Amino acid sequence: MKTIDELLAEGVAGKRVFVRADLNVPLDGTTITDDGRIRAVVPTIAKLAEAGARVVVASHLGRPKGAPDPAFSLAPAATRLGELLGAEVAFAADTVGESARAAVAGLADGRVAVVENLRFNAGETSKDDAERGAFADQLAQLADVYVGDGFGAVHRKHASVFDLPARLPHYAGYLIATEVGVLKKLTTDVHRPYAVVLGGAKVSDKLGVIDHLLERADRILIGGGMAYTFLKAKGYEVGSSLLQEDQIPAVREYLRRAEEKGVEFVLPVDVVVAPSFPDLKTKAPAHPTTVAADAMPAGQMGLDNGPETNKLYASKLADAATVFWNGPMGVFEHPDFADGTRAVAQALVDSSAFSVVGGGDSAAAVRILGFDENAFGHISTGGGASLEYLEGKTLPGLAALED
C-alpha cells in the first residue's frame, strides 16, 4: 500500500487530488455534535494543500436513499473543515454535476473543495458493478490522483471506496495508515494480558469478532444491550430488556468454547433498570434502580451496568497490557445510564495498557463524557471497519489501495 508520503515525494503541486474522507458526523439539525471524524482527516488534507495540491474532498453522511436530501448535506461538515484548516473551503452543491465541476475547475493550488454527499447518487452504493463503475468514472473526471483516508468506510464496496482507486493512481492517507498500523498490533503482535470490552445493542453485530477473539483474547467483558442475551443464555430472567432470542444458541456455544479455551468471559453482576427506555431529548429523570443481574424484575429494562459490575470490570482491566473496546455499556446519552460507560473509559485512562477505542458510539461516548482523547492509546474512526478488520475479513477499501 503506497502512502501519501510517497505521493508528496513525487510532487503534487497543481494536481487535483481526490481525498475520500469520512465526514459522517452526527448532526442535530445543522449542528455537528461530534467533529472527531473531521479532525481525524485534517492532517492529510492540510499536508496536501501545503504541498500545492488542489484538494477535492468527498464523503458520505448518513443513509440518504440515493437522491439529494437536505437533512444529509455535507455543508456543515465543509464549514467545520474550513474552521479546522484555518482556510476557506469551497462547497459544491452536487457531487459530480455542474457545481462540482465548477468548484474543482476554480481551485487554485493549495486550496480545498468539498463536494456534496456521495450517497445522493444511487451509483455510490449500488450492488450493480456497472452502475457503481459508471459513477466512479464520473468521480474520476474530477481528479488526477486518489487518496483513501475514510477508514470508517473501508468495509463498504462502494464506488468512491472500491471502484475509484482502480481508475487513478492511489495512495493511503495518514489516517488509514495509522488505523491499519494500530489494528495490526491487535492481530499480530499483541501484548498480554489482552482484554476486550464489547458493548452496544445487538449481539448479532459482534458474533464474528467474538468468534475471532476467542482465539486471541485472554478475557472478554460484555456490556450494553447485548449483555441481556448473554444473561438469558445463562438462564437468568431479563425483564423487558433488549433480547435477541434467536442468538441464544450461538451465545451458549461461545460461552462453552471460551471455557474450553480458558478465555475468561465476564458478564454484569448487577444492572441499572428502568420501566422504559429514557427520553434522550429532554433527559427527564428515568427513575432507575439497581438490581442483581440474576434477579431482574419483570417489566423492567436493563439500561446500564451497575456499580458492582463497574468495580469488577475496572479490576479486570487494571492489569491488562492491551485493551480493545467497542460499544458503550449502557445508554450513555442519558445521565442516569452513563456510569457503566464512564467506568470503562476511566479504567482505561487509569491503566498503563495500550488501549484502542474501536470507533462508533464508544468513540463518541469518550468525547461526550469529557475524557481527554490523548489519554487513550488510539481512538479509531471506524466502528464497523475496525470490527471487520479484527474478524480477518478483506476490507474492499483497503484491498483497492493495495493493488
From Swiss-Prot:
GO cellular component, one term: cytosol
Annotated positions binding substrate: 22-24, 37, 60-63, 119, 156
Location (main, coarse): cytoplasm
UniProt keyword annotations, A-Z: ATP-binding, Cytoplasm, Glycolysis, Kinase, Nucleotide-binding, Transferase
Signal peptide: none
GO annotation (BP), single: gluconeogenesis
Pathways per UniProt: Carbohydrate degradation; glycolysis; pyruvate from D-glyceraldehyde 3-phosphate: step 2/5
Localization per Swiss-Prot or TrEMBL: Cytoplasm
Protein name: Phosphoglycerate kinase
Gene source species: Streptomyces griseus subsp. griseus (strain JCM 4626 / CBS 651.72 / NBRC 13350 / KCC S-0626 / ISP 5235)
